[in-house]
């Protein structure tokens, strides 16, 4: 087993892992957004699950499109709650990121790592992860949008940029 692990992972295994990560991340960001839209929030609402599962499925098939869709849902949540400036800023930054990040799975996974890692207090590790898996222009754009995401999540209740802990602030 260890000898095979040293040989590395096949392209199929890397692609599968990237798509699973993108599906989980897209679903998580969409859930965060849908939970904060008053008209569709709640686990009993089928629209909540349509948004979450739709973004997760899109993330599994086309990771950058899943990231884009989930961030649109999150921006919509901010706009629906009356936070117009952060909602428009997040929407504009997401659109700008998409022009750089749509060229592969790595930038999408780097962006989605900000939400997943921040949920357990590891936001600084997501910047390292993003820099490791992407080229410099993609890493800069992804880190900028990830920083805006961390700032937005801090405004949801934790008031801490790097330690937004989902267990205490959901």
Cite the ranges covered by each PLM segment:
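Cytosolic juxtamembrane amphipathic/interface segments immediately preceding
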Residues: 2-17
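Juxtamembrane/interface motifs at transmembrane-helix termini
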Residues: 86-91, 107-108, 148, 161-164
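Core alpha-helical transmembrane segments of integral membrane proteins
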Residues: 13-81, 90-98
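Transmembrane helix interruption/hinge and helix-loop junction motifs
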Residues: 38-44, 60-65, 78-85, 102-104, ...
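Cytoplasmic-side transmembrane-helix entry/capping segments in multi-pass membrane proteins
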Residues: 67-75, 88-89, 105-117, 141-145
